[in-house]
Amino acid sequence: MATDDSIIVLDDDDEDEAAAQPGPSNPASNPVSPGPEASGPSESHGDGGSSNSGSRKCYKLENEKLFEEFLELCKMQTSDHPEVVPFLHKLQQRAQSAFLASAEFRNILSRVLSRSRNRPAKLYVYINELCTVLKAHSIKKKLNLAPAASAESSGDNPPTDPPSDLTNTETTASEASRTRGSRRQIQRLEQLLALYVAEIQRLQEKELDLSELDDPDSSYLQEARLKRKLIRLFGRLCDLKDCSSLTGKVIEQRIPYRGTRYPEVNRRIERLINKPGPDTFPDYGDVLRAVEKAATRHSLGLPRQQLQLLAQDAFRDVGVRLQERRHLDLIYNFGCHLTDDYRPGVDPALTDPTLARRLRENRTLAMSRLDEVISKYAMMQDKSEEGERQKRRARLLATSQSSDLPKASSDSGEGPSGVASQEDPTTPKAETEDEEDDEESDDEEEEEEEEEEEATEDEDEDLEQLQEDQDDEEEEEGDNEDDKSPASPSPIFRRKEFSNPQKGSGPQEEQQERGLTGTPASPLEASPGLPSTDAESSGEQLQERLLAGESPVSQLSELDMEALPEETIPSPEERGISSSRRKSDSSLPTILENGAAMVTSTSFNGRVSSHPCRDASPPSKRFRKEKKQLGPGPLGNSYVKKQTMAQQDSGWKISVLSTPSSPLASVGPVADSSTRVDSPSHELVTSSLCNPSPSLILQTPQSQSPRPCIYKTSVATQCDPEEIIVLSDSD
């Protein structure tokens, strides 16, 4: 009987056994007193009862013998794990006595024992199966309280024993009638199960072609439908037999989870992954909702970010463990009755090279198709994410533009002088771009500042190098022109007339060509776009006055007055005051480090420095660096006049603002003595920014905050070999 591997179908003895099954108190008395004294009550029931009890005793003795043989086999095979045998003993003691003396337990033991002897490598699988069966038929703790309570009551009140015996016999009779009534259903379900198993085996033996995969009635789909029906029949049969439907598969094992430090969250996640029903794989959203519910119900007080981190860690851990369980279930249950006799050393692909090559080709094809499917949906996901990102950027830009509209309307309003302030068309774009960059991230702003500092340092180095070269050229020219009088008005500029005066002349185009950028911030600054005809006329007037030999200072002052708006043109009284100040300033001796007089702001190739004084903004970073390098000296309180000139293709545009001595006046860099020329103004050569006069500062409205402005000069566009300034040495 022990070596029998087939499933034994229950015979009519089980019906008699179930019919003659005693109450809960009788099975406990039978094992304790198996002698002839206990056989008295059974003899009173007749010959049928004695035969049933005899069959039960035979089953029990046989089951005990089979269980001992299985334990001996486990001792030999599981010497590395000695705790296996005591664990099996404990489970047997906790099992129900009726189940231990049943034919079902005998069939399970015989099957497990025979398979363990044939396949010792899978011994632990069969041990697990036996443990699952014993746990399913173990005595529950709640059921153990009833016999104890009845025993106490029987001890205290002996006359109540006969009614309890009557109730036990009544329940036994009802159970026997119910069992006899469902006997026919059980037999019918068993026949259906056998029929389904035979049909499934027949379908598994059929060859499946690739063309049949799309057929809705293919053998593979028929087999899947029959297996689902078989599972439902098995569950119904277990309900009728009042036994557990667990089969010991890995997929049925409960997964304990202790991944977080919060027991409430652990219990919620464990309940989620061990939910009864189909093996569903929870996604990140399910885990996050479970964590949030646990935190809300138990008032954990965790922030949103920490809940997300907990959910992410739990999702990774749970996903790995569920994948491992599915993989093990696939390994244990893969195949069919055709692969039951498979051994690792008898693979036909090891001896047949054609089959091995075909299997490798099929595997390569399967992996390539799998990669195509994965890449397809990965690209679809990337496209959807990119589309969402672009929509988000569009919304942010729309909101930023809507917030910039009131600012632009306030900036375009009328100033205190009654004239609408106009802005340079290049500045709003730069300001909006800077604001967007500031709103996006501060790192980009720091990188831009570093790049600007590097660019200004490179420009300073280029300017210094060009200044040294020009100084050498000026010294050579000064040696050749010593015979000329320093006071005689010599021609200063020799300029080539442009053949095409109609070439686009605008301040914006000129600044783009020469690399100049400015940010006006007050209504006192010049309008951004003078007409080309005005620029040409101003250039012609400048050329005529230069040829007539007029003083450059007067020329520059008159052109400056013409360029300024009407409200900013000084009255005759103010002109007299400014002229008196200019005379007093010119009468004061200004001392340089080498004792030379100050000269005009003339560029290296004969042009006037193109750094327009725009507003009362604080000095730029470059100017602060120059001021630090300058340090305290004799020029700290000197009077410096900045002259600015911007060359256009059709003429010259010059603006001059005088800066008298004031606490607000900034100190320009010290010019080298080699840059001195014979000029009527006798002022310092400088190319730094200038501050406006106090009168202009007072006219600036207090409500308008000064804006920083950066002026960049491209040295490469200034050095024109055809425009030469003839310099003379004043010494």
From Swiss-Prot:
Region of interest: Interaction with histone H3.3: 181-414
Ranges for region Interaction with SPOP:
617-731
UniProt modified residues of type Phosphoserine: 25, 211, 409, 421, 485, 488, 490, 499, 527, 551, 571, 617, 661-662, 679, 693, 728, 730
A Gene Ontology biological process noted in the UniProt record is: negative regulation of transcription by RNA polymerase II
Location of the region described as Necessary for interaction with USP7 and ATRX in the Swiss-Prot/TrEMBL record: 1-158
Q: Where in the cell is it found?
A: Cytoplasm; Nucleus, Nucleoplasm; Nucleus, PML body; Nucleus, Nucleolus
Modified residue annotations for Phosphothreonine: 456
Family, according to the entry, reads as follows: Belongs to the DAXX family.
* Region of interest called Necessary for interaction with USP7, as start-end residue ranges on this chain: 345-560
Q: What's the PTM story here?
A: Sumoylated with SUMO1 on multiple lysine residues.
Which PANTHER family has this protein been placed in? Answer: DEATH DOMAIN-ASSOCIATED PROTEIN 6, DEATH DOMAIN-ASSOCIATED PROTEIN 6 DAXX
User: Which Gene Ontology terms of cellular component type are present?
Assistant: cell body; cell cortex; chromosome, centromeric region; cytosol; heterochromatin; microtubule; nucleolus; nucleus
- What Pfam families does the record tag this protein with? Daxx, DAXX_hist_bd
- Provide the protein name: Death domain-associated protein 6
Q: What is known of its domains?
A: The Sumo interaction motif mediates Sumo binding, and is required both for sumoylation and binding to sumoylated targets.
Record PTM N6-acetyllysine, positions in chain: 503
**GO: which molecular function terms?**
enzyme binding; histone binding; JUN kinase binding; kinesin binding; molecular condensate scaffold activity; nuclear androgen receptor binding; p53 binding; protein homodimerization activity
